[in-house]
């Protein structure tokens, strides 16, 4: 998770190697390895949204309503991601790879409502207590 003046960002990091395909609304995605072996795994975009919603709810209950966003990072070198969005939703969970990880930094630092300093301090205290 990343915490900055734009709120909290939950980052689901995956270390899969190969090509990831599917649709962002699918329950499972397909991973095709370089050997041709295929396996399915739970859609990390859905997984991270559940985590982000849980964190946002916990923060709101603690009296610190804070924007919480989520994203997915496939960190393994050479992993390619080919995901579609058949429903053309406006609020799609962003998916980043090692190659475009610098866009992830921009997403964390520049997307979302700017928090006041006291909100950031309160958020930090709550998160430290959650450890």
Where are these regions (language model features)?
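Ordered hydrophobic segments in well-structured contexts
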Residues: 1, 8-10
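Surface-exposed interaction regions that form or flank ligand-binding interfaces
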Residues: 3-5, 17-19, 31-131
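Hydrophobic, well-structured mid-protein blocks that either form specific transmembrane helices
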Residues: 25-29
């Amino acid at each position: 998770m990343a915490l900055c003046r734009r709120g909290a960002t939950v980052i689901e990091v995956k270390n899969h190697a190969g090509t990831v395909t599917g649709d962002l609304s699918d329950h499972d995605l397909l991973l095709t390895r370089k050997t041709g072996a295929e396996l399915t795994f739970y859609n990390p975009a859905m997984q991270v949204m559940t985590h982000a919603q849980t964190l946002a709810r916990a923060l709101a209950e603690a009296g610190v309503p804070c924007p919480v966003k989520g994203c997915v990072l496939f960190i393994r070198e050479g992993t390619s991601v080919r995901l579609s969005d058949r429903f053309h939703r406006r609020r799609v969970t962003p998916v980043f790879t090692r190659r475009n990880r610098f866009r992830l930094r921009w997403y964390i630092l520049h997307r979302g409502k700017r928090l006041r300093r006291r909100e950031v301090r309160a958020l930090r205290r709550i998160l430290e207590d959650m450890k």
